[in-house]
Amino acid sequence: MFLERGYIATTLEMIAQTAEVAVQTIYNTVGSKRDVLNGVLDLSAAGPSAPRPVREFMQERVAATQTTAEMIGVLADWFVEAGERTAPIQQIIRQAAAVDPEVAQLEKQRARQRFENYKLAASALAERGAMPREMTREEAAGLIWTIGHPGVYRFFVLELEWPPARYRAWIESRLLAQFG
């Protein structure tokens, strides 16, 4: 509904009516409209058949890799997968953040959440001895965050019309240049 009508025009009453529940049920189970938007982003990121939250299954994917190059391949795959699934809802969040302080706060929280998740990836790289000696884990997380940012996907794939395979190869080459 957010994608069809936009954030501002979508009300909790509309969402409740579509879901055939009372508005109070949404408040009790999910929370505010901002919380619903956050939940939509979570579901979009995880994908339709995700068995667990993103953080958990990504840790499993990374742990299953044998080499740094394989791990970087997992990250590159993830950035493409997540970009494809979340680009539309990320656009809604970006637009709504410009006019709604609660959504602006959500956007900041999600950016921080991605950064914290990429600290885990940086730690995995450090454990493999793949980080340059002068680079801190926080700096490595910042580099991964920057390369994997939803805005980078939007620019290269949606605006420049790069095929996802080219975008993936670009991510992989940039990360391998730093950590490979």
What function would you assign to each model-found segment?
Residues 32, 86, 99-101, 150:
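Short loop-to-helix capping motifs
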